[in-house]
Structure formats: C-alpha cells, structure tokens
C-alpha cells in the first residue's frame, strides 16, 4: 500500500475503504450524502448529536466519510464548498507536523490535528488561508509523514510559543488573533496587489459612516483622569494641526522612510506594514502622540532606542520581521497593550515573558531591568550682565516643584522605574541639588508638612537655611497624621544673610468668598472655593546692606478648564502683595541687628562651620510700595499665552479677557484686574537665543514653561540664569522624573542685583522708642524654631 494509491482514482465503484465495502447500501447513502453536503449547509450541532444517538454506526461512518472528502480539514478549500455554513468552521485542525503522501492531499489524520491545533491556536480561526498547493506538493517521496522539524510557515514548533500540547493563554491568543489579521492584510497587499489595506478598512470611518473598525484606534478613550490630573494644558487641543491623524503607507515596497514623515507629529496611527524596511529611523521618537504603529512583514532586525519616546503607543505590531532583541527603552511604553512579535527570531527569554505573562509584564521587566543611563551634561550658568558693581546687593533665587510623594504614582508616571520614583531616592537627589545651588532664597511647591518638618528643615539647617511653610487649607479639617501628608508651599532663606521681618498666608478660596464684591457670586462658590491653592508672602531685610525685599511663592490650580480660576487666584495674590507692600513701606527699622542671631540649633551638630555674621548695615527706607524689590516665584500651571502671564507681565487684564469665560467674579469681571508693579519673567532674557528655556514641566505629551521667577524691573536686574537641561540627553528621555531628574518639573534659578536708586543716597534710619530687647524677641518669634513645620505665628 505504501507505493500505491489507497483509494480508487477513476471510479466510484468502491468509494469507501474495504472495511465499509461490504455494505453497499450504506456506502451509496454515505456517498450521496457527502456529495449533497457540498451544496448545503451542515446540520446544526443539535441535529448532528441526535443523529449520532439514533444511529451510532451511521454517525461514525459519516465522520470517516467527511474526513475522506475533506469536510473537516484545512487544505485551503472554501468552507462552503466543503459543506460548512458561512462563518462556521468548527473543529478545523491544522497539519503542521504531518506531510501527506504526494498526490493525496485530502487524507485526514484527526488525532494529529488536535495536537497541532493546540500548539498553534492562533491560526485555528483562519485555516482557509493556508496554501493548498504549497502544502501538497514539492515533498520528497521518502519524507517522513510525521516530521516535526518545521511548520508550514517555516517556523519550528519550539519557536511558536512552547510545547504544542499546552493550550495558549489569553495573552498569546490575543497575539495570534492580531497575527492572523496581519497575515490577511499582507496577503491582500502582496497577492491581490491591493496596497493601503488599512486605509481601505477605515474608509467608512473616514467618511463618517461608522465607528472605528480597529480596536484602540483614534476614537479610543484617551488618558484617564488620574493620568491628566496635574497636566496644566489640554494636549489634544493644542496639537490639533490637521483634520486627519492616520497615515497608511503599507504595501508600497518602501525600503526607507523619509525624514519628512516625522514632522507630522500629530499622527495617531501609522501603518508601514508589508514593505521592505530594514530599520526604523531614530526620528520615530518625534511621533509622541502615536497610538498604533503597524510595521509587520518588513525586514526589521532591531528597534531604535528612540521608540521609547512614543509613550502614547497602545499597539505596536512587528509580526514577521527579523528582530532578535528589544531595547530597554521599550520599557517606557507604559500604555502599550499589545506588542506583536510572532514571526520574529526573538530572544527566548523575552518570548517566554510575553507568552506567559503578556505585553504589560514584558514592558515592565524592560523598564525595571534597564541600567541607569549616563547622566546629562550639567546645566550651565548663563551670564546675562557682566561688569556688575561688587557693592550692589546680590540675591540668588531658585523655585522648584519637587513632586509630592503622594502624587508620584506608577499610574501617573508609568514610564519611570520604581527605584527612581521612590521618595527615598528622590528626596536625597533634591536635597543634593539644593545644596549644590546654594541660593539665598528657595521657593518649593508640593512639599508636605512632614517632609518640611522632619527632613528638609533639619537637613538644610546645616547649610544655614531657615524656612517658612504652609500646607493647603484642607489640612485643617484632617487628623494630625493625615494633615502631615498634605502638601503646600515653603520658602527657605539663608539665615546668615537675611532677616525675616514678616510672613503671610494667602488662602485664595477663603479670601474670595469673604470679599464683599464676590461673596454673593455663584461662580466663586462653584469654581474658586473648591480649589485649595495657596500663596506665601515673606518680607526680608539684608543683614549687610539693610535692603528689604518681598518674596512670594505660589502654586495655582492645575486644571486646564479652570483658566478663570487661575486668573482670579493670581489677581488675589497681586492684590495682597500690593496691600502688604504698602504696610511694609511703613515697617519700623531694625535697631540692633547684632542681637538678632541664628538659633544655636542651626549649626551646633553640623560639620559645616557656622557662617560669620556680616557687619550689619542700617535699614533702608522706601517711599512707595513699588520701591521695595519684589520677587514672585511659583508653579503657575499657565503658559505664556495665558491671561495669568498677561496680568503679571502687562500689569492689567480687561473685563473682556476670554479666560473669564463669562463667569462673574465681582470687581474683577466688572472693572478688570490690575497691579502697580512693573514685572518681568527672569527667563525672558533667553528668548530667541540658543539657550532659550523650552520647558519647566517635562512629561509625555506636555513640555511647556509653566514655572516662573517674576521680578520688579525698577528695583532688580538679572545678572545670571541657570541654563536649560542637556538637549541631547533628552532625545531618549520621554519624561521626568527619572534617575537624574527627581521631579516632573525642573528647577529654575536667577541671580539678581538690587539697583541703586537714582538721585538718592542710602539713608540711615535712627528709630525711636521700643527698646532693642522687644524687637529682638519679635524677630526670634519669626525666625525661631517654631517656623520649622508651621507657617502660622
């Protein structure tokens, strides 16, 4: 039998194997039934079961007969021709390990099918795609009919996700379903010569006929509420440059991608499958909004590290390429739901991870196992003005949103390794950065009460710093433990150089609801009152020169939908700065600066020597509130196009300002908002230069300047600024924080000199009354230990 045909080829006189030939009536009935079944649908499962129970012998014979005539095997025939109902292909096994005898492709080996179907379950739903001619021809006569070396598509069984006997899990089933879709698209573009398969698939959607045909497409839900919680601007609105967001370049035979493609940074979906691409350019990292990248059926052997910049990716399909390894930067793709790698000679360890535990687990493994990257080049100081008189008073100021620990979650910052995101690591990096900068005035946002009290205050005291801190007002309604974790704002200052004269908390919501012109406005209660943002105002005097300066620090609302609230908060801040500046003009001079010393707790146990006290100078006199040097720092969550920036830089906002949005805020919306100070952002001096600061907040999807150091131009002059971060380093950094940048904001720093007032000499004020002892006691209350951990007097 091995050398001859098992069945008659020219006649139907013996249509069945010899074991059924004795029953001619049964054989004839079976043959007729088989022929008719080629033109009618199969009976339902219930009918088949009933027939089997009524006549077991007939059922068994029917199964054998159908196997003989190819009713239930995957040889490439259309299922309708084999008698199957449209869309129904039950129990369609695949012949991966079996090589049939030449010339007899229709023989069935059902026991073998079951094993192979389990080993390659992903193809089980599309058995009709298998090539009949390839499978049944070109086989040597002496080939073993049970070879297991290779599957029909050229892959070994071991390369298809493990032993064939083990059923695929849900992760791998999803992988194989997408692989089949990719195969179908590739077949249509190469065999049927129909390129742009995905554009054709989405044609109804593009015409507005139906919804998205592809899961996870442009119409898929965007970022979660938690992911955008602290993003100060709507990314989708800002980057809407076109009415289209998808591009299909598949099936074109492309060998390289033009660099012009990557200028379309608004793309959400990019299809470059079924080409001849051997690499992806590093510019792929510019497509920061990309959610789907289909690059299957190419000749890719590796992925560029810059692929990690595409943190919006949800689906990355790389089926049937030549990729052996994956870059660690792929771990930054924390939103990736599916990584299609089937058909690649991928590293066995990576393959096992994705097969057993899925894409999310593989991405997280790459993220956590990645080595710490090399540090960036240090940020350079940029001299703005040279030849500054050494006799002028200098003030170095830094502001920094340090990212409160309770906000640093893996959901929010999934692209950051847990080691770099932990507070224990970040707080040490922040502390070291503060010490290295050695500024006179330090303004911090998002600093919790316990962090201020238990960590920064005692640590920075060793470096001659004293501090003032207030938490958000909601801390008043909490128990002591919960209140300690509430973040707020802080101002640290060098105690050997500056004396704290006064400090004030600006509670925006409380002030707004108690204003006579606003307390009856519904918008105040509905929009402003729920936000518990604050500001701090401190009044200092220089020990050496007697110059006085006002330093304010604030953190405004973050929501992009609350532009009106941010404007109201800024207006309240400037209104109170104006009010307190008028009070500070009349502030009594200090009579005995020598008696106002740094508390002994600052330097008793420190290895750093106690700083020498300068020879004190007399307190200076100011005629108006605008004469006092003013510095206003903070995280404003507002860009240069905002009304907040307009108010601070121009000094006025009209009632017609669009950011008010039709809401009513008393005098602010009736008369407009104004302040008397001439103010400028310190970093304006770098605009238009190679060192221009392009961001202060750096996270995926948002890189903008929203932190500022404002100063009064009539009293202060910028002499030096801290330059931007290393741009080359950022080409592979999707967002902060990371091992080298411990917060999602960067620190900005400016050094000022206090201008000498024209035509006026420094006046020595000889105060009268109120002995020195009482004044010293007042200063000790302001600057003493009770300031550490509490902003209230």
Swiss-Prot record:
Q: Which GO terms describe its cellular component?
A: CCR4-NOT core complex; nucleus; P-body
Q: What class of enzyme is it?
A: hydrolase
Catalytic activity of the protein: Exonucleolytic cleavage of poly(A) to 5'-AMP
The Gene Ontology biological process terms listed for this entry are: nuclear-transcribed mRNA poly(A) tail shortening
Q: What GO MF annotations does this protein's record show?
A: 3'-5'-RNA exonuclease activity; metal ion binding; poly(A)-specific ribonuclease activity; RNA binding
**What are the EC numbers?**
3.1.13.4
Q: What is this protein called?
A: CCR4-Not complex 3'-5'-exoribonuclease subunit Ccr4
């Amino acid at each position: 039998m091995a050398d001859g045909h098992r069945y008659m080829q020219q006649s139907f006189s013996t249509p069945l194997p010899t074991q059924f030939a004795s029953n001619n009536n049964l054989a004839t009935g079976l043959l007729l039934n088989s022929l008719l079944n080629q033109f009618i649908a199969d009976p339902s499962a219930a009918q088949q079961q009933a027939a089997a129970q009524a006549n077991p012998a007939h059922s068994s014979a029917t199964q054998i007969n159908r196997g003989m005539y190819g009713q239930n095997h995957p040889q490439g025939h259309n299922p309708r021709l084999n008698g199957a109902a449209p869309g129904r292909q039950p129990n369609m096994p695949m012949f991966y390990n079996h090589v049939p005898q030449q010339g007899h492709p229709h023989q069935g080996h059902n026991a073998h099918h079951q094993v192979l179907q389990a080993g390659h379950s992903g193809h089980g739903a599309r058995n009709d795609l298998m090539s009949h001619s390839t499978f049944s021809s070109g086989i040597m006569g002496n080939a073993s009919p049970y070879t297991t070396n290779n599957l029909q598509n050229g892959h070994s069984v071991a390369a298809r996700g493990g032993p064939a006997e083990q059923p695929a899990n849900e992760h791998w089933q999803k992988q194989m379903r997408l692989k089949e879709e990719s195969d179908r698209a590739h077949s249509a573009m190469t065999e049927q010569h129909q390129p742009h398969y995905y554009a054709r698939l989405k044609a109804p959607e593009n015409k507005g006929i139906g919804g998205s045909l592809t899961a996870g497409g442009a119409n898929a839900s965007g970022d979660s509420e938690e992911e955008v919680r602290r993003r100060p601007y709507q990314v989708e609105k800002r980057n809407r440059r076109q009415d289209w967001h998808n591009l299909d370049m598949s099936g074109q035979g492309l060998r390289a991608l033009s660099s012009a493609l990557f200028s379309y940074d608004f793309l959400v979906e990019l299809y470059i499958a079924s080409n001849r691409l051997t690499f992806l350019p590093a510019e792929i990292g510019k497509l920061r909004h990309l959610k789907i990248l289909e690059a299957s059926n190419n000749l890719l052997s590796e992925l560029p590290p810059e692929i990690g910049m595409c943190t919006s990716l949800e689906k990355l399909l790389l089926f049937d390429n030549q990729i052996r390894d994956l870059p660690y930067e792929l771990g930054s793709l924390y939103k990736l739901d599916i990584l299609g790698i089937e058909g690649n000679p991928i590293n066995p360890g990576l393959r096992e991870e994705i097969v057993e535990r899925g894409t999310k687990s593989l991405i997280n493994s790459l993220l956590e196992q990645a080595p710490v990257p090399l540090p960036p080049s240090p940020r350079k100081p940029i001299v703005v003005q040279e030849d500054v008189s050494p006799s002028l008073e200098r003030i170095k100021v830094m502001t920094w949103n340090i990212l409160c620990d309770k906000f640093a979650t893996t959901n929010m910052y999934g692209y950051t390794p847990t080691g770099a995101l932990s507070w224990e690591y970040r707080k040490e990096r922040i502390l070291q950065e503060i010490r290295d900068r050695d500024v006179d005035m330090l303004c911090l946002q998002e600093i919790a009460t316990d962090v201020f009290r238990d960590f920064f205050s005692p640590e920075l005291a060793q470096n001659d710093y004293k501090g003032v801190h207030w938490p958000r007002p909601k801390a008043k309604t909490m128990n002591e433990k919960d209140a300690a974790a509430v973040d707020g704002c802080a101002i640290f200052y060098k105690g050997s150089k500056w004396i704290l004269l006064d400090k004030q908390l600006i509670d925006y919501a409380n002030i707004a609801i108690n204003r006579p012109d606003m307390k009856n406005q519904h918008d105040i209660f509905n929009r402003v009152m729920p936000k518990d943002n604050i500001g701090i105002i401190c009044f200092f005097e220089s020990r050496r020169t007697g110059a006085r300066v006002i330093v304010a620090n604030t953190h405004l609302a973050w929501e992009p939908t609350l532009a009106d609230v941010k404007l109201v908060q800024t207006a309240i801040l400037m209104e109170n700065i104006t009010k307190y500046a008028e009070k500070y003009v009349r502030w009594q001079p200090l009579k005995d600066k020598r008696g106002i010393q740094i508390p002994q707790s600052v330097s008793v146990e420190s290895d750093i020597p106690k700083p020498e006290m300068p020879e004190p100078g007399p307190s200076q006199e100011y005629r108006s509130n605008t004469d006092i040097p003013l510095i206003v720092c903070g995280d404003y969550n507002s860009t240069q196009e905002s009304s907040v920036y307009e108010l601070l830089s121009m000094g006025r906002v009209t009632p017609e300002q669009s950011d008010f949005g039709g809401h009513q805020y008393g005098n602010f919306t009736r008369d407009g908002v104004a302040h008397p100070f001439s103010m400028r952002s310190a970093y304006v001096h770098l605009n238009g230069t190679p060192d221009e600061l392009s961001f202060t907040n750096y996270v995926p999807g948002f890189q903008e300047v929203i932190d500022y150091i404002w100063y009064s131009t009539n009293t202060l002059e910028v002499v030096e600024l801290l330059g931007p971060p290393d741009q080359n380093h950022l080409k592979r950094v999707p967002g902060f924080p990371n091992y080298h940048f411990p917060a999602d904001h960067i620190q900005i720093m400016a050094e000022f000199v206090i201008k000498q007032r024209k035509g006026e000499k420094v006046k020595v004020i000889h105060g009268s009354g109120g002995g020195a002892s009482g004044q010293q006691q007042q200063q000790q209350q302001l600057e003493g230990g009770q300031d550490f951990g509490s902003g209230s007097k």
